[in-house]
Amino acid sequence: SYGHTFSDYPWHFHQQQAKAGIPNDEKFTHSWKYLILISLSKIILNQDNSLPFNDESREAMSKLEAFIVDAYGSRDPDLTQVFNPQREIRLKPHFELNFKILKAGASAESISIADLPTVIQEVNAQLMKLVLASLNPEHKYFIAFDQLDLGFDNKADDYISRLIGLLLAGRDINIAAKNAQVKFLVTVFLRDDIYNVLRFEDKNKITENFMSLIEWDTPRTTKTLKSLMEKRFSIVASDIDIEQDVKWSDIFNETREMPGHQSKYDHIKDRTYLRPRDMIKFANSALAKFKERLNSPASNTQDDKR
């Protein structure tokens, strides 16, 4: 599996990969597919020790490795540099492409990343064949995208286009993987308020066939962020040889209400907007303050330690 958070991703490089002459909703679809396929190539070449699992897989992996190493100088390339405009990638002898589509002055042997959008559909098609043929059908593979809400601006057309392109790319690759009978899934974690503002032609189909709603603390579910945090507390406790389930009340003293007669859980929940990562940050901040007070000479009471 591989996870993308994009906190330090060079969006300005990706921005230059917009494919011209097609609708805005689709202009980033092919560049997302390329990034996903390169990510999956990294898993194939560096993580799954069961590969190659047969002769077809061995042949596909050999071709895939030759392209990746030739293009990026390593079988484990830095994904933040995939679209670096200073880079060139060799097309021959790795891919059989229609080189007539290259713009004037471009080489059939290699192409600059700046010119990649002119052939990216053909490159993706070849890459797709290689990665799907390489995968072990008994294993499960995941590429996940998260924190796409960082810097969200519903008035920024390119931001919206990038999100739509990612959803379309993930949908297309998931369909291809299913048809190839391999267990590979592209997963995009996106806040529902952001998803709701997206407008594109295939949205209804994606909503009906490819979307799962993950929610907590709503009338529709019994799942809560409190239970999620308790699981994390227990995992941390097991790391220090505490073999027991850790409850929320073991960490936070709920007998003492917050201002406004709120429980500590409701207080934290309201200030983290039901975002798990923000609740984790809040809990870590509370832990840091607890340690400060614990080490303070003025802290002597049990209440100070809850």
Regions from the PLM with identified roles:
Residues 1-141, 151, 195, 200:
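P-loop NTPase nucleotide-binding core
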Residues 49-53, 230-299:
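Conserved AAA+ ATPase small/helical "lid" subdomain
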Residues 3, 51-63, 160-168, 284-290:
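Amphipathic alpha-helical scaffolding segments
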Residues 1, 303-306:
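Short, intrinsically disordered, charge-balanced linker/junction segments flanking boundaries
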Residues 23, 27, 114, 118, ...:
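Short, solvent-exposed segments of well-ordered alpha helices
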Residues 41-55, 153-157, 176-182, 198, ...:
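Short, solvent-exposed secondary-structure capping/transition elements
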Residues 121-261:
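The catalytic "switch" region of P-loop NTPases
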Residues 17-22, 158-161, 200-207, 289, ...:
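Short secondary-structure boundary/capping segments
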